[in-house]
């Protein structure tokens, strides 16, 4: 192939490295008013009285909006970027009299510059009726204190939600008699695992600017993964027609799922709609840390049964998830904790998966790369590693005996057939890469330090089956170059480049001959958005279909110009020529000009794609750590990974995606953590407290690919974006066990915990 499975440079690479104006604040109108949010200091309270009279007198202040400017009985909305009807409940108002976490919005302050807005915010006086908060998610379900007692709370989808029980969702499913199967097992691992909430920590914070156009329509330029969902979110929040809203995506400085929620879009949209003036809201780093959309805290109770020979016979999983003050992505993330972990073990005769998602008075959680699978895989993979130790078996060996194979039916993965799978080859590759036989389980370096290894495996999905929609428009321009118009959002992943490669392969042209534009709700074809690992698999297939149809149209018009039939010509990317006489030909430019001069053959095609299945990508990872027994410091000195993502459309981009995901997983395993004090105040409000690993903190990260061929994907491709974050958690936890003999069931695993465990083991 000429363009697919080739390592092309990203289309926007030079723009970014040369500092061209591509981000939201670069493109915002010069006369934007500044918007700031006055936030609650209480985790649960009612606003009794708010006095903005003095604040409004500050020179330059345009407006201050409070709950009194919002109908408290109006229909609520969700900020979640999901296909309608959303699984996430409608539980928000633009400004609610009832504030539900420290950082919830009390007032919107608008002024000519940041200085006057900051001054006005200090002059706002608020009296609260402080209520007792729900801060422990273990006690939230059926707690007499309700996070959402209001009657206009609404759940559009049957997800088991009940605001009068603090339940955002409940579900139960299974296959076979799990209790009977576990009763017959020789060994049962029964453990509880806990993963804390953690931040996406993208470099560009949440930000949006808005203005009214000449036609009286609200224009929104937002750093978002979900332009079409944002349009619906804003329409629902402001109670205005979607036809009055246009949403545009600039270049995004990272998202990782955080921007699958309309965190910043609603408030400036509200201001511009009210004032008819342009404005912008840019979150500070503190706001992005304390009032955003982090990963869900989860607790997972795993019972895993096996024979004495190591065959996993049954898995029983209960997941309790903390959605925080609002329910964005709560019902959907929790499902992946089981449906993307249990199916890895193809010989299991039974499974049960029960989940509850509860409201608390913590910051609202949301989408983060891995989307619940990360938490569930930490639990299930850690249980399998403990099973291997109990049976004195090698962790690689026990997985080789149990893994799902190509062609298997996966009851825990919605009964789907495993259409493509190279998991067995990934296991062998990583075993070789990390030199497992010579390093497992631990080596003493003789200086108070040891080196140990651990491993884990993972699966994810490729889009949301039967729901996600990807679309593309392709057209030939008048001198023979192509425009590819998409609704998917490139947030640094390089999907503009990847999708162009797919089109170029079909059209047999150079990658530079395709320009990519998106995403804009007025001009782009509908796309669900860049989330759920859907872009390459779903939108990429739409691009492939679109390019195939356009190729046919080029041949049809070329045949007209050559005065023959369509089946008598061929197109080589540059010329349409007669099969019988290749010297008789017309160039693509001539065909393009002809389409604009007296011919009725359109050279602009739009195609849409949705998939009834979501074929899983697979990954195996192994970590080698160096552990200092005196200080408890753990450093990952080597990480070996092998991914099956089907055909890698662009190996360079898939490699850096994998490296970045591994780095995030290492952070979640060792340092990243959101904690609260006794009153519900978040403790990590900057990168001084919230520690993300830098490149200098990590040793080698090595990535290889073992490609299966997915027949339903473009050129055999599956997804890559999310599966890559999942393996470091169980791998590092197991390596620490191999180093010091203590298992940890809660993340992150800190140096203090490790040092104390070493001391206890002496």
Report the location of each language-model feature.
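C-terminal catalytic domains of large/alpha subunits in multi-subunit enzymes
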Residues: 67-68, 239-244, 274-279, 308, ...
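Short acidic, glycine/serine/threonine-rich loops at helix termini
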Residues: 74-79, 120-123, 222, 231-233, ...
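Catalytic phosphate/nucleotide-handling subdomain of diverse soluble enzymes
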Residues: 462-524, 539
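Extended active-site and interfacial segments that coordinate phosphate-rich ligands
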Residues: 14-15, 122-129, 133-135, 225, ...
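Helix-loop-helix junctions that connect adjacent transmembrane helices in secondary transporters/permeases
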Residues: 147-238, 403-481, 683-704
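Glycine-rich loop/linker segments at domain edges
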Residues: 6, 12-18, 82-85, 161-208, ...
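Flexible, low-hydrophobicity surface segments
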Residues: 1-162, 188, 274
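Thiamine diphosphate
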Residues: 232, 253-276, 280-281, 495-503
């Amino acid at each position: 192939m000429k363009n697919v499975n080739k390592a092309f440079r990203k289309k926007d690479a030079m723009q970014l490295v040369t500092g061209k104006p591509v981000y939201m604040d670069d493109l915002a109108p010069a006369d934007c008013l500044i918007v700031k949010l006055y936030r609650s200091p209480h985790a649960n309270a009612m606003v009794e009285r708010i006095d903005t009279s003095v604040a409004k007198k500050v020179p330059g202040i345009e407006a201050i909006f409070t709950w009194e400017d919002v109908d408290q009985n109006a229909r609520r909305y969700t900020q979640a970027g999901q296909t309608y009807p959303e699984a996430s409940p409608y539980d928000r108002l633009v400004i609610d009299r009832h504030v539900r976490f420290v950082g919830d919005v009390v007032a919107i302050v608008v002024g000519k510059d940041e200085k006057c807005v900051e001054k006005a915010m200090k002059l706002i006086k608020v009296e609260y009726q402080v209520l007792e908060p729900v801060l422990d998610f273990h006690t939230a379900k059926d707690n007499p204190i309700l996070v959402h007692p209001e009657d206009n709370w609404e759940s559009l989808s049957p997800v088991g939600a009940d605001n009068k029980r603090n339940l955002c969702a409940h579900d139960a499913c299974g296959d076979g008699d799990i209790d009977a199967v576990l009763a017959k097992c020789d060994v049962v691992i029964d453990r509880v695992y806990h993963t804390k909430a953690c931040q996406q920590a993208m470099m560009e914070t949440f930000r949006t600017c808005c203005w009214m156009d000449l036609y009286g329509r609200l224009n929104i330029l937002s750093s978002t993964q979900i332009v079409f969902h944002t349009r619906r979110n804003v329409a629902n929040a402001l109670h205005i027609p979607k036809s009055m809203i246009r949403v545009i995506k600039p270049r995004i400085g990272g998202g990782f799922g955080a921007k699958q929620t309309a965190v910043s879009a609603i408030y400036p949209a509200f201001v511009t709609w009210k004032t008819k003036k342009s404005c912008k809201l840019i979150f500070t780093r503190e706001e992005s840390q304390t009032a955003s959309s982090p990963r869900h805290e989860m607790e997972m109770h795993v019972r895993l049964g096996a024979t004495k020979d190591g065959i996993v016979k049954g898995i029983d999983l209960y997941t309790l998830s903390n959605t925080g003050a609002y329910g964005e992505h709560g019902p959907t993330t929790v499902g992946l904790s089981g449906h993307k972990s249990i199916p890895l073990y193809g010989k299991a005769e039974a499974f049960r998966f029960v989940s509850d998602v509860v409201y608390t008075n913590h910051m609202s959680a949301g989408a983060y790369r891995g989307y619940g699978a990360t938490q569930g895989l930490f639990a299930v993979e850690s249980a399998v590693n403990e099973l291997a130790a109990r049976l004195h078996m090698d962790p690689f060996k026990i997985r080789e005996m149990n893994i799902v194979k190509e062609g298997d039916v996966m009851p825990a993965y919605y009964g789907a057939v495993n259409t493509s799978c190279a998991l067995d080859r990934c296991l062998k590759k990583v075993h070789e890469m990390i030199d497992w036989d010579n390093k497992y389980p631990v080596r003493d370096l003789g200086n108070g330090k040891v080196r140990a290894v651990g491993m884990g495996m993972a699966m994810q999905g490729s889009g949301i089956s039967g729901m996600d929609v990807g679309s593309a428009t392709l057209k030939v321009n008048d001198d023979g170059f192509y425009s590819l118009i998409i609704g998917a959002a490139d947030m640094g992943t390089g999907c503009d480049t990847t999708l162009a490669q797919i089109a170029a392969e079909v059209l047999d042209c150079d990658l530079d001959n395709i320009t990519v534009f998106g995403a804009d709700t007025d001009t782009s074809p509908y796309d669900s958005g860049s989330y759920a690992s859907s872009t390459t698999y779903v939108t990429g297939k739409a691009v492939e279909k679109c390019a195939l149809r356009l190729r046919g149209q080029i041949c049809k018009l070329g045949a007209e110009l050559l005065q023959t039939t369509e089946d008598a010509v061929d197109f080589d990317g540059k010329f349409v020529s007669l099969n019988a006489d290749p010297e008789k030909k017309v160039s693509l430019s001539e065909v393009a000009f002809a389409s604009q001069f007296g011919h009725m053959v359109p050279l602009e095609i739009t195609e849409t794609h949705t998939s009834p299945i979501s074929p899983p990508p697979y990954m195996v990872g192994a970590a080698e750590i160096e552990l200092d027994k005196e200080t408890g410091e753990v450093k990952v000195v080597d990480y070996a990974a092998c991914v099956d993502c089907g055909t890698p459309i662009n190996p360079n981009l898939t490699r850096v995606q994998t490296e970045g995901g591994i780095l995030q997983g290492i952070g979640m395993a060792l340092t990243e953590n959101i904690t609260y004090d006794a009153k519900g105040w978040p403790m990590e409000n900057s990168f001084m407290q919230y520690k993300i690993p830098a490149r200098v903190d990590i040793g080698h990260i090595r990535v290889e690919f073992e490609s299966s061929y997915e027949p339903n994907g473009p050129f055999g491709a599956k997804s890559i974006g999310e599966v890559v974050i999942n393996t470091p958690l169980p791998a590092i936890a197991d390596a620490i066990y191999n180093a010091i003999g203590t298992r940890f069931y809660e993340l992150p695993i800190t140096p203090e915990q490790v040092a104390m465990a070493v001391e206890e083991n002496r």
